[in-house]
From Swiss-Prot:
A motif (HXXXXD motif) lies at residues 104-109. It catalyses: a 1-acyl-sn-glycero-3-phosphate + an acyl-CoA = a 1,2-diacyl-sn-glycero-3-phosphate + CoA; 1-(9Z-octadecenoyl)-sn-glycero-3-phosphate + (9Z)-octadecenoyl-CoA = 1,2-di-(9Z-octadecenoyl)-sn-glycero-3-phosphate + CoA; 1-(9Z-octadecenoyl)-sn-glycero-3-phosphate + hexadecanoyl-CoA = 1-(9Z)-octadecenoyl-2-hexadecanoyl-sn-glycero-3-phosphate + CoA; heptadecanoyl-CoA + 1-(9Z-octadecenoyl)-sn-glycero-3-phosphate = 1-(9Z)-octadecenoyl-2-heptadecanoyl-sn-glycero-3-phosphate + CoA. This is 1-acyl-sn-glycerol-3-phosphate acyltransferase alpha. It comes from Homo sapiens. NCBIfam families: AGP_acyltrn. The HXXXXD motif is essential for acyltransferase activity and may constitute the binding site for the phosphate moiety of the glycerol-3-phosphate. Residues 1-26 form the signal peptide. Keywords: Acyltransferase, Endoplasmic reticulum, Lipid biosynthesis, Lipid metabolism, Membrane, Phospholipid biosynthesis, Phospholipid metabolism, Signal, Transferase, Transmembrane, Transmembrane helix. Widely expressed. Expressed in adipose tissue and at high levels in testis and pancreas. Expressed at lower levels in tissues such as heart, brain, placenta, kidney, lung, spleen, thymus, prostate, ovary, intestine, colon, leukocyte and liver. It holds the Pfam family Acyltransferase. The gene is AGPAT1.
Amino acid sequence: MDLWPGAWMLLLLLFLLLLFLLPTLWFCSPSAKYFFKMAFYNGWILFLAVLAIPVCAVRGRNVENMKILRLMLLHIKYLYGIRVEVRGAHHFPPSQPYVVVSNHQSSLDLLGMMEVLPGRCVPIAKRELLWAGSAGLACWLAGVIFIDRKRTGDAISVMSEVAQTLLTQDVRVWVFPEGTRNHNGSMLPFKRGAFHLAVQAQVPIVPIVMSSYQDFYCKKERRFTSGQCQVRVLPPVPTEGLTPDDVPALADRVRHSMLTVFREISTDGRGGGDYLKKPGGGG
């Protein structure tokens, strides 16, 4: 059905209004810029996943597909003007399985992870990610390990299987032991699953600390600008000879060392680090 002339004029006016409003909001409203940037960030990842799926599908579900995802995601930091500095990469054990533990601040953690991700390393993620459209399918093809955190028995069973996989397939896993994104500019208490996994498999733990994003990103303040982030790889922590009884002390010791480094690298060159006292940075 043909539109009457007035409707065409109305559509044209709405189009012109959008052309005017969007740039105005972009330059005049930090909150609008925040929402635009986050929408593009998530949408772009979903689009890249669509491109990655047919390439990864050639191998099927395979940890080597993580190299493809990493290659496709590395450029995102340039789109947002974020400089990622990596220090301590020589601490990665060269030829053995291990468990990476890292602090968890925001969905932007993906940028730091892709920058430093070692070979044959896959994250352990919450099962909900599996249903995140193209991103979920791409992650499944890349060997990401999904855990239903609400079903403790299933999670323990999966961790036992992962321990065997570490040893038999020379795989490394990346775990966020806080269990959820942290909004308070510090570190939440660590859940012990990653440490039980490392002790069960008798493999080292490699702590990785990402500095605070508060100088360029804050969900609570609706602020997202350009900036820099430091990713620090700490020396591996051996677990040989440890038993499940040693896990609580091990988790506390690793968290303490990571928190010390987090405070150090989050205040270095950032005006004394007052923003570390502000809650609400995650997202």
